[in-house]
Structures are given as C-alpha cells and as structure tokens.
C-alpha cells in the first residue's frame, strides 16, 4: 500500500495540446484532471497557447497555464508549448507541485522535466504515442530510421521518470524496453464514464445533421489522419449500399485528409450515403454514438482506442481492424467482428453480417455494454492515485 494514501496531492499534468483539440490524449487528460480535482487534489494543466486559448484559463474546472507555442503542420490543432524552465519552476513552486505527470512527450514535457528535476519533484510518464501516429506520411524508406530516433527520444523522457503508465498491456509490451531497468510501471486504462455515455436520448441530432433516422447507420469517430485508415471504410461502402441502400455512414472528426476522403466518396458515387460531421461537441458525440447502429474503427495503430470504449458504453456492436499495432482489436470478443487490415472487401463482409441481422446487432450491443463496465474511469483514477503515491515513495 502507498505510504501517503490520504495525502491530497498537487499535480501538474503536461499536455501541449490541452484544450486545443479533441484527440484521445487531450480528452483523457481533461477527464482525469477533472476527476482528480473532484477527489480533493489540486491539479493544473501545462499546455500551448492557441487562437482559442491565448492566456491562462480553465478546462473542465482545472486551471490551465498556456505558453508561447508553434503549430505542427497538418496536425489539426496540435501546438508545441515552449515555456521556459524559469517559468515552470516558478509555477511549480507557487502551486507546491508534488508530482509532474507527462502525458505527451512533446516540447512542454522536456521543459517540465528540467524544472521538476531542478526542484526534486517526482515525475510520472504516460505512454500515449506511437511512431505510426507521427511518421505514416513520411516516405516508407525513412520510416524505420525515424522510428528509431523517436524511440531514443522516448528513452530519454521515460528515463527521467520515477514510474511509467501504459493504457494497455499491449502498450507495455511495445514500450517497456524504452524505460529504465526494473522501472515501476502500471497498466491503467483511459477508462470511460459509464453514466455520461448511457443516455439513449439523441434529441434532434438526426434533423440537425440531416441523417435519416430510418437508415442503418455506421459510425466512425476520430482524427482524419493516415493511421486511422478511414479510406478503407469509405471504399467498403459501395459493396454495402449495393445490397442495402438504406445504409448510411457518419464520420465524426476533423483532419487534413477530409477533402481527400470527400473526393474519394464522390469518385465512388456514394456521397449521399456519407455525412461528414466534422468536430462536434461532447454532447453531440454521445448523440452520434446513440444514433448509430454499428461502430467501425479501421485504425492501423491504437495504444487503446477510447472511441471503441465509448461505443461499447453506448451498447453498440463494434467492427475493428486486426492491425498488429492496434490494441483496440482486443476489445472484440462476442460483441463484434475483426476484419483484415486495410482490406475493404473483408470490412464490407463483416459490416454486412450485422446490417443483415438486427438480432445479432442487439446481442453484440448488449455484450459491448457489459464489457464496458470493466473500464470504469473512476477505477482508473484510483489506480492513477496509487501510481502517484508510489512515485512519491521512490528516491531521487
């Protein structure tokens, strides 16, 4: 048991794009920060300035310090934060920080680590990134080299931490060799707030987004980036609508590939069967899950896949790529189907099994909901507290 089980902590969560986009790591950080604060801890976020957040502000009721930044091209709201060591040292002193939690290994993390080491503050590092998230658009010939460079950088980040956190066992198996020998670590799911996603109401969602409610609706939620392989899903649609004209695909999310994906849909003659919703509010995202019939994630790389958990919490059957670098495939167990990575014909076959069979959709949906109970975010927050307390026990 941790030495300080009742101590309320002062925690600095370092996440450069905090509040500036809706990626999984940002959503997870916001949720963890809010729940940690509700449990009595003092939490602050350190992130990058943006057009939306030029000054220090609050996100989910948590104080956020935003610093000078540089945007990452084609990143859809990802900015690199550049506070100075002096600035973070001052903030960490003023906030009496006990633990610095690195959520992303970006520029803000490097500076936060230097400030934390200067003050003797404990560091916990979280694994939220894969080379596939960064280098998939680079020429294939240089991707292995870039991956090795990235791993050496992660070794430096992880080597400065008292302990490491992985969202899944797969993430630990992929990344644990980048940490120090015998370094304490924990597997903590990003989790899901079951109460938040259990509402079956969709309000006027269908009307506002012009989606016909009588159709069988497929749903994708995520960034429109190469590693999400959304083109595979769009290419599967012609075969599906050939047999079921009442099938419709909803795509929630933004990214630099949107125009290319819209053009692909147009070239395939299926524009009327797809709605690109773009970025939506958290409330409308939940409405989208509940308005859908089948959730599809064709991603090539996922260290967990929070959107799959969200779909499961809404009681939806899931269809997921069997990609080697995707932990999301492990969510599929009598609640949906796997399909061969980037094989749009196989994806169409798996989707049609569910489009053709409403009772099977209902069965798989119920199983998804039951399985989602194993990922209650409140248990994840308790585990996160234990990781912090364990880090405080460690020696500098």
Task: Label every PLM stretch briefly.
Residues 333, 337-344, 353-359:
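Conserved acidic donor-binding segment of nucleotide-sugar-dependent glycosyltransferases
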Residues 198-211, 217:
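A short helix/loop element that forms part of the nucleotide-sugar donor recognition site in Leloir-type
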Residues 1-56, 60-66, 382-385, 389:
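N-terminal subdomain of nucleotide-sugar transferases
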Residues 49, 170, 191:
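Carbohydrate-associated surface elements
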Residues 92, 158, 279-280, 287-292:
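Short alpha-helical donor nucleotide-sugar binding micro-motif in glycosyltransferases
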């Amino acid at each position: 048991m941790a030495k300080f089980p009742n101590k309320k902590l002062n925690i600095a969560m370092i996440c450069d794009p905090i509040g500036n986009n809706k990626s999984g790591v940002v959503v997870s950080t916001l949720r963890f920060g809010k729940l940690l604060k509700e449990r009595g801890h003092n939490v602050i976020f350190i992130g990058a300035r943006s057009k939306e957040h030029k000054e220090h502000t609050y996100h989910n009721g948590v104080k956020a310090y935003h610093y000078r930044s540089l945007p990452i091209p084609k990143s859809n709201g990802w900015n690199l934060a550049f506070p100075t060591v002096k600035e973070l040292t001052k903030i960490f002193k003023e906030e009496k920080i006990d633990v610095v939690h690195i959520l992303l290994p970006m520029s803000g993390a490097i500076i936060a680590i230097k400030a934390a080491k200067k003050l003797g503050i404990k560091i916990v590092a979280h694994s939220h990134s894969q080379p596939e998230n960064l280098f998939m658009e680079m020429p294939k010939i240089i991707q292995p080299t870039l991956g090795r460079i990235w791993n050496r950088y992660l070794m430096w980040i992880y080597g400065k931490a008292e302990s490491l956190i992985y969202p899944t066992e797969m993430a630990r198996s992929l990344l644990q060799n980048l940490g120090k020998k015998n370094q304490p670590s924990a597997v903590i799911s990003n989790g899901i707030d079951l109460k938040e996603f259990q509402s079956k109401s969709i309000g006027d969602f269908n009307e506002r987004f012009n989606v016909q409610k009588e159709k069988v609706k497929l749903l994708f939620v995520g960034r429109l980036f190469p590693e999400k392989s959304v083109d595979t899903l769009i290419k599967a649609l012609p075969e599906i609508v050939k047999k079921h004209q009442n099938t419709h695909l909803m795509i929630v999310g933004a990214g630099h590939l949107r125009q290319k994906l819209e053009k692909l849909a147009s070239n395939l003659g299926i524009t009327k069967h797809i709605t690109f919703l773009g970025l939506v509010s958290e409330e409308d995202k939940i409405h989208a899950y509940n308005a859908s019939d089948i959730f599809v994630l064709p991603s090539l790389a996922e260290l967990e896949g929070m959107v799959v958990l969200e779909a499961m919490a809404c009681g939806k059957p899931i269809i997921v790529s069997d990609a080697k670098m995707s932990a999301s495939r492990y969510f599929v167990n009598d609640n949906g189907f796997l399909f061969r990575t980037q094989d749009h014909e196989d994806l169409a076959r798996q989707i049609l099994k569910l489009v053709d069979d409403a009772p099977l959709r209902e069965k798989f949906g119920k199983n998804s909901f039951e399985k989602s109970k194993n990922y209650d975010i409140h248990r994840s927050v308790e585990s996160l507290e234990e990781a912090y307390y364990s880090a405080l026990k460690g020696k500098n």
